[in-house]
Amino acid sequence: MSTYISDRELEELGEGLTRHYLENAHVQMAARCIDIEGLANYLGMTVVFETFAEEDRDKVGFLADGRTPLKIRRKGSIVSFCFPLGTIVLDAFLRQDKESGRRRFTIAHEIAHSVSEKHNPVPQFHRIYDSEHGYTFQELKAQLTMTENQADRRAAVILMPQFTVDQALRDFN
């Protein structure tokens, strides 16, 4: 079940989470780039890379609930593998340097889901939108849910909290 959270609340929650991490991990508050994998580890999450073999090729990230299997390629075969609760699984292509922005956002997106569903973990996929793909109504409906929108919003705030944006503006003006 989705609960509506205003944009302002999402921003406060995301920024608060990032501040808490930076303060408790003894990271400089003026950091321009949030160590998103460090934040995931700080929250007790593990980030791993696998080659996805899901039918939906838009899936690039997965937040494991410890029960739901993910189809991956291992040694040339497709296997269904159950990752431990709190594991963020990223498609292996996201390791490429040119995918660093998408990799960072996907990790932040899955962190946002984890924080939102802390008391009732459910498996979550992060999908990319392919402008050349002809989506069905059901596919679009799955991508454009309130839960996904909120996770995207919170991910953006986790990566770029207002205090880092303000600092960057001061530094470059």
Model-derived regions, located:
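Active-site hotspot residues in diverse enzymes, especially metal/ion-binding acidic/histidine motifs
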Residues: 1-173
